[in-house]
């Protein structure tokens, strides 16, 4: 029986994916085998020694200490794409709303309460909110992952000309992307072409301030920018300067800050991107399935700190080893399995940066003594026998 601790409210649709005969779900345990989390801050949390996995029901993992988890042999999962439709729909909605000045117009309409000549006031006042149609306009999409590719495809369907930039596009994303999306190999070449720019990349040291003073100079005058990925991807002082000069005519974002609120041309939504019951259910289901498969079978899918390793069982016991990505590890591991007289039925080894994972199915005397010897290899962090 594995114990799963839930932090935050996890959708019951996801929890239902955990077999009650194998998993005990609790909010009170101090010694969980796995943790399901949404937004709770774990950065300063001391983890129990037997904690094996943390699954984040969402894409971002900046609330989880990844380096420390790797050092302790804790696999961290996220759920990329589970909330993609929710975010993409909001982006398209805000693209249209921002173009047609809907938020400001709707707010102004509320001020007409009690106006005896409302019809005349409407006809007179609507002129200040005239906006543009998006059909025939050019959209630049930075990042063509699960969300960016959906936004690009939707924009194509709405009659926009779409350019996409993503030097790291996955095979799956490429297959799902409309052939009508123009591929740009250089961001600086794409920016001058776009009436609208939407950004869909993770927040990393290398992506911080993707939109900055220099990139803004390359943009069309009057460009509109949408940021429903992470606030830090856009340099706020540079953006505000560009709004003041008219280089940027509109900024739609899901990340309000004191500096942005009340500024002309800025539309802030309160982090609504994934705030739908459907997205919460999808994230919870994916997180539950990931943590379940890892605890039961050692398979790793959508981990942010360990490589993806998924293999069907080949019989016998399964040995799962988290270790540092160093030369000679395979030979040290197989030397011990040979010494134990094991027959390896299946074996896979993959690495991710400085971490690696070796999983093998073997018949013979797979026991605690072997696990102890494997654990004694200096670069080995954790050994599990399933």
Name each model-derived stretch:
Residues 213, 221-313, 357, 384-386:
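Rossmann-like dinucleotide-binding domain for NAD(H)/NADP(H)
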Residues 1-79, 192, 212-214, 218, ...:
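An N-terminal-biased, well-structured beta-alpha scaffold segment characteristic
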């Amino acid at each position: 029986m594995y114990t799963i601790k839930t932090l935050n409210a996890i959708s019951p649709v996801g929890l239902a994916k955990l077999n009650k005969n194998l998993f005990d779900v609790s909010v009170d345990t101090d010694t969980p085998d796995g943790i399901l989390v949404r937004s709770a801050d774990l950065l300063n949390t001391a983890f129990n020694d037997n904690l094996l996995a943390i699954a984040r029901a969402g894409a971002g993992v900046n609330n989880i200490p990844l380096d420390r988890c790797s050092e302790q042999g804790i696999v961290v999962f996220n759920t990329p794409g589970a909330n993609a439709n929710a975010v993409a729909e909001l982006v398209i909605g805000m693209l249209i709303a921002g173009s047609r000045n809907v938020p400001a117009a709707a707010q102004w309409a509320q001020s007409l309460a009690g106006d005896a000549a409302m019809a005349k006031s409407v006809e007179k006042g609507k002129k200040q909110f005239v906006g543009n149609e998006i059909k025939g306009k050019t959209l630049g999409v930075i990042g063509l992952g699960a969300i960016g590719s959906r936004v690009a495809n939707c924009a194509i369907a709405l009659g926009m000309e779409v350019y996409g930039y993503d030097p790291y596009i996955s095979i799956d994303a490429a297959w799902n992307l409309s052939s009508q999306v123009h591929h740009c190999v250089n961001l600086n070449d794409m920016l001058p072409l776009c009436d609208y720019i939407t950004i869909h990349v993770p927040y990393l040291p290398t992506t911080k301030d993707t939109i900055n003073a220099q990139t803004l100079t390359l943009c069309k005058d009057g460009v509109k920018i949408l940021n429903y990925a992470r606030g830090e991807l856009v340099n706020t002082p540079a953006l505000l300067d560009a709004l003041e000069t008219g280089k940027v005519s509109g900024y739609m974002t899901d990340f309000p800050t004191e500096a942005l609120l009340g500024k002309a041309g800025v539309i802030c939504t309160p982090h609504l991107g994934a705030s739908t019951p459907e997205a919460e259910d999808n994230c919870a289901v994916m997180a539950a399935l990931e943590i379940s498969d890892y605890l039961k079978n050692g398979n790793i899918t959508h981990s942010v700190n360990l490589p993806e390793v998924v293999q069907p069982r080949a019989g016998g016991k399964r040995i799962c080893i988290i270790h540092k990505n160093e030369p000679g590890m395979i030979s040290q591991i197989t030397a011990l399995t040979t010494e134990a007289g094991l027959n390896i039925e299946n074996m896979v080894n993959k690495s991710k940066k400085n971490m690696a994972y070796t999983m093998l199915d073997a018949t013979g005397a797979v026991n605690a003594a072997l696990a102890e010897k494997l654990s004694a290899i200096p670069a080995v962090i954790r050994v599990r026998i399933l």
